[in-house]
């Protein structure tokens, strides 16, 4: 190694994670931060969550490829912690290339990334159908079953595609197992071996130019002085270990997963940016202490909840499912901050609260008559949480597009200040609209 290489100051690495149940607006913030990054990394999840970007008024939804792909010259990485559907990947690549973006020469996929195969999707959908009203609310895209195979040490990985004979042998073995479950337990149809083999091997040559030793590349890029941005998917409260289990996703969505899911040393993660909306949302089943619902009909949102959903366009970017809405839950936020080691917060969708007469903040709970200031760990206990609120005056002025703290309405500043106090970490960024320019910067994650 040359003396000049030794003297290069390593780049700075920032991890972006959701602190709620996903859908916090991470995509826009990752895109904004990419101005100061030379690489963006996905380290967990699959194509079950969409990151929505509004650039110059044009809407783009990315499900698998890192949001940095929207910036020419930025390298994008899919780490070993991701589960990859080649079909979804090439569909997304095609959409981006049709929009005039270069993708393949800037996208690097870990050879150790687990593949999603047709039988994973079949099992996912058959399970949900069997559960009926008790379903968790998966997207049916095979994410969970693919992670099950990974933990069960039977997963097929990207690198396996390049040895057709071994791939075929292992695929046949896997199908013997999964088809038994599909037909004998779930009552579904068997997945055809030859059709699956032909489809998957057909991706091999198309994937090969993008396959890389991602862990090594990230190490070398960082030590050459280049900044890296690690883009989390879903949110902390959906984490397989730390979320409201079993109403969770199948991967670790917390900041620590960036190290394992991309193959980087944890000491290289310099700053953790926690993304929180100015209110809360949740998709699918599971407890939600601060949910806004009609007291006379708990299965329906109340009028404020409906307003938040409509103004905030709270519909899943991948599934189109409506999101449940509620006030910001600071007790849940504190739990996420502790788990992730959050350095600073970015509050998104502040503008959605414009026009409300009052704004509430959940600062704790009553659980069976006892006070609690932190979200419990189990779903059953979370379901017994009765929210304790502080109430703030609303603001009638529009905050849309404001990009300085002092220009915010006084009541909006008071609300944000109180959130900082109860959270115990600073709010470093505030989003006041979907476009990248509609952002207030208080401390820059790459410059702290």
Swiss-Prot record:
This is Adenylosuccinate synthetase. Homodimer. GO terms for cellular component: cytoplasm. Its EC number is 6.3.4.4. Plays an important role in the de novo pathway of purine nucleotide biosynthesis. Catalyzes the first committed step in the biosynthesis of AMP from IMP. Substrate binds at residues 317-323. GO terms for molecular function: adenylosuccinate synthase activity; GTP binding; magnesium ion binding. GTP binds at residues 22-28, 50-52, 323, 349-351, 431-433. InterPro entries: Adenylosuccin_syn_GTP-bd, Adenylosuccin_syn_Lys_AS, Adenylosuccinate_synth_dom1, Adenylosuccinate_synth_dom2, Adenylosuccinate_synth_dom3, Adenylosuccinate_synthetase, P-loop_NTPase. It comes from Burkholderia thailandensis (strain ATCC 700388 / DSM 13276 / CCUG 48851 / CIP 106301 / E264). The keyword Iron does not apply. Belongs to the adenylosuccinate synthetase family. Pathway: Purine metabolism; AMP biosynthesis via de novo pathway; AMP from IMP: step 1/2. Keywords: Cytoplasm, GTP-binding, Ligase, Magnesium, Metal-binding, Nucleotide-binding, Purine biosynthesis. Pfam families: Adenylsucc_synt.
């Amino acid at each position: 190694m040359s003396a000049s290489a030794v003297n290069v100051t390593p780049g700075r690495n920032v991890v972006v994670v959701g602190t709620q149940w996903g859908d916090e607006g991470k995509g826009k913030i990752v895109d904004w931060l990419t101005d100061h990054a030379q690489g963006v990394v996905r380290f967990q999840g699959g194509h079950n969550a969409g990151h929505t970007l509004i650039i110059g008024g044009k809407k783009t939804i990315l499900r698998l490829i890192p949001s940095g792909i929207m910036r020419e010259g930025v390298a994008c990485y899919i780490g070993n912690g991701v589960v990859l559907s080649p079909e979804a990947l090439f569909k997304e690549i095609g959409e981006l290339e049709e929009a005039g973006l270069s993708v393949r020469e800037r996208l690097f996929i870990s050879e150790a990334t687990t593949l999603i195969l047709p039988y994973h999707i079949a099992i996912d959908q058959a399970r949900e159908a069997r559960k009926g009203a008790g379903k968790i609310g998966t997207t049916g895209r095979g994410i969970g079953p693919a992670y099950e195979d990974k933990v069960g040490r039977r997963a097929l990985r990207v690198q396996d595609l390049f040895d057709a004979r071994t791939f075929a042998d292992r695929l046949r073995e896997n199908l013997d197992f999964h088809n038994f479950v599909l037909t004998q337990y779930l009552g579904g149809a068997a997945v055809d071996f030859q059709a699956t083999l032909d489809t998957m091997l057909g991706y091999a040559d198309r994937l090969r130019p993008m396959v890389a030793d991602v862990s090594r590349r990230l190490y070398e890029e960082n030590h050459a002085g280049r900044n890296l941005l690690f883009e989390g998917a879903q949110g902390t409260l959906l984490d397989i270990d730390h979320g409201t289990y079993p109403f969770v996703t199948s991967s670790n969505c917390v900041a620590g997963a960036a190290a394992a899911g991309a193959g980087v040393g944890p000491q290289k993660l310099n700053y953790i940016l926690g993304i929180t909306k100015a209110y809360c949302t949740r998709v699918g089943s599971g407890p939600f202490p601060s949910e806004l619902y009609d007291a006379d009909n708990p299965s329906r949102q109340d009028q404020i909840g409906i307003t938040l959903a409509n103004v905030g366009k709270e519909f899943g970017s991948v599934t189109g499912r409506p999101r449940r809405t509620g006030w910001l839950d600071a007790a849940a936020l504190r739990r996420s901050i502790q788990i992730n080691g959050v350095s600073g917060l970015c509050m998104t969708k502040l503008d959605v609260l414009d026009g409300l007469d009052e704004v509430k903040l959940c600062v704790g709970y009553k659980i069976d008559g006892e006070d609690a200031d932190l979200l419990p760990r189990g779903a059953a206990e979370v379901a017994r949480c009765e929210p304790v609120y502080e109430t703030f005056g609303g603001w009638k002025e529009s905050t849309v597009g404001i990009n300085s703290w002092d220009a915010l309405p006084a009541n909006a500043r008071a609300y944000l200040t109180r959130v900082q106090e109860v959270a115990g970490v600073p709010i470093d960024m505030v989003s006041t609209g979907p476009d990248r320019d509609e952002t207030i910067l208080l401390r820059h994650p790459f410059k702290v």
